[in-house]
């Protein structure tokens, strides 16, 4: 059901998704997660706050992690799809980030949001495993972003050193500047 309802529109680019694991009090430490999903008949009632959610404002759907069973640590975490616009689901203002500004990042607020059973991804208690599998796949992309940012910084440093004139010459001609740029290049 979930694949048919959500994946096709995400894969085609018609819809945008977000991943919400981190929380204000615990960061990405899932064992201290405060967001809860309480089973009530054919749905769950989800309450809590998520932060640092990339695409949180512009997303149509959010993958949400919440505690369905307290006292068992990460084994009590489950994963859900929550749709934008459902009662009790609010987006915070965008964070003013220093980088990766092509996507928004914000807090998300869930105040007794009614989520149907069929929006549970996997089974109850499998959320932590799903989160780790997703994060592992994303680490390559994050590393590529970091490498790209570092390379762009090196390129900007070289460019600036050729343009900046000090004592009648570009600072790129001074050995101290060359050493600093070489150090940056070696770190990359």
Per-region residue spans from a language model:
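A short core secondary-structure module
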Residues: 43, 47-91
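FAD-binding glycine-rich core of flavoenzymes that anchor FAD
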Residues: 1-23, 39-42
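Buried hydrophobic positions in well-ordered alpha/beta secondary-structure cores of metabolic enzymes
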Residues: 19, 37, 46-48, 64, ...
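Internal helix-loop-helix
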Residues: 1-8, 12-13, 54-61, 73, ...
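Glycine-rich beta->alpha junctions and the first turn(s) of the following alpha-helix
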Residues: 89-188
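Short Gly/Pro-enriched turn/cap motifs at secondary-structure boundaries
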Residues: 25-28, 52-55, 69-71, 97-104
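Cytochrome P450 C-terminal beta-domain/meander region
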Residues: 29-47
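Short beta-alpha junctions and helix-cap segments that line functional grooves
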Residues: 5-6, 33, 49-51, 92-96
């Amino acid at each position: 059901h979930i694949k048919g309802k959500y994946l096709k529109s995400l894969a085609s680019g018609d819809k945008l998704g977000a991943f919400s694991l981190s929380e204000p009090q615990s960061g990405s430490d899932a064992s201290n997660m405060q967001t809860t999903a309480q089973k009530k008949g054919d749905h769950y009632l989800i309450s809590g706050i998520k932060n640092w959610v990339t695409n949180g404002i512009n997303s149509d759907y959010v993958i949400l992690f919440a505690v369905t069973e307290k006292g068992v640590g990460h084994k009590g975490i489950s994963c859900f799809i929550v749709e934008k616009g459902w009662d009790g689901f609010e987006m915070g203002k965008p964070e003013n980030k220093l980088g990766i500004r092509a996507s928004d990042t914000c807090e998300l607020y869930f105040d007794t949001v009614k989520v149907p059973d069929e929006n549970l991804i996997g089974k109850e208690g499998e959320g932590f495993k799903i989160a780790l599998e997703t994060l592992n796949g994303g680490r390559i992309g994050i590393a590529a972003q970091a490498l790209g940012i570092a390379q762009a910084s090196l390129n900007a440093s070289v460019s600036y050193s050729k343009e900046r004139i000090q004592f009648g010459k570009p600072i790129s001609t001074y050995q101290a500047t060359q050493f600093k740029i070489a150090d940056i290049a070696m770190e990359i």
